Amino acid sequence: MNGGLCLCVLMAVLAAGTLAQPVPPADSAVPGAQEEEAHRRQLRAVQKVDGESRAHLGALLARYIQQARKAPSGRVSMIKNLQSLDPSHRISDRDYMGWMDFGRRSAEEYEYTS
């Protein structure tokens, strides 16, 4: 019930919002004028981009590239760590003495009463 009421209120608000927007005038004398105006607006927006913000972005990219070159990639360092481990090495935070891994028990451990 509450969900339906909320949906109706939402639809009413959306409908009222679309009806409240002004209707653009239909200028039949010059049909391409609106397209030209939109193109001019886009050009003005592009021209507003400062050279300063471009320089700031360039500095950030340069700093990121320097850090990426200095730091070893995670994959290579992981491979080196794995190669240095002994194959019989136990993972100390995951393998516990006395714990049973239920996925590896064999059927021979059980005594079945038939």
Swiss-Prot record:
Protein name per Swiss-Prot or TrEMBL = Cholecystokinin
Compartment(s): Secreted
Q: Which GO terms describe its cellular component?
A: axon; extracellular region
* Stored InterPro entries: CCK-like, Gastrin/CCK, Gastrin/cholecystokinin_CS
- Gene designation per UniProt: CCK
Prodomain residues = 106-114
Has the keyword Kinase been applied to this entry?
Answer: no
Residue numbers bearing the Phenylalanine amide modification: 102
Q: How is it modified after translation?
A: The precursor is cleaved by proteases to produce a number of active cholecystokinins. Brain contains CCK-octapeptide (CCK8) and several CCK-desoctapeptides; whereas pig gut contains intact CCK33, CCK39, and CCK58 as well as CCK-octapeptide and the CCK-desoctapeptides. Distribution differences are due to tissue-specific post-translational processing events.
Q: What is the recorded function of this protein according to its Swiss-Prot or TrEMBL entry?
A: This peptide hormone induces gall bladder contraction and the release of pancreatic enzymes in the gut. Its function in the brain is not clear. Binding to CCK-A receptors stimulates amylase release from the pancreas, binding to CCK-B receptors stimulates gastric acid secretion.
Keyword presence, Nucleotide-binding: no
- Molecular functions per Gene Ontology: neuropeptide hormone activity; peptide hormone receptor binding
- A GO BP entry: digestion
Q: Which UniProt keywords apply?
A: Amidation, Cleavage on pair of basic residues, Hormone, Secreted, Signal, Sulfation
Tissue specificity is: Synthesized in both cerebral cortex and duodenal mucosa.
Modified positions (Sulfotyrosine) are 96, 110, 112
List the signal peptide residues. 1-20
Membership in a protein family: Belongs to the gastrin/cholecystokinin family.
How does this chain assemble? Binds to CCK-A receptors in the pancreas and CCK-B receptors in the brain.
Q: Which organism is it from?
A: Sus scrofa
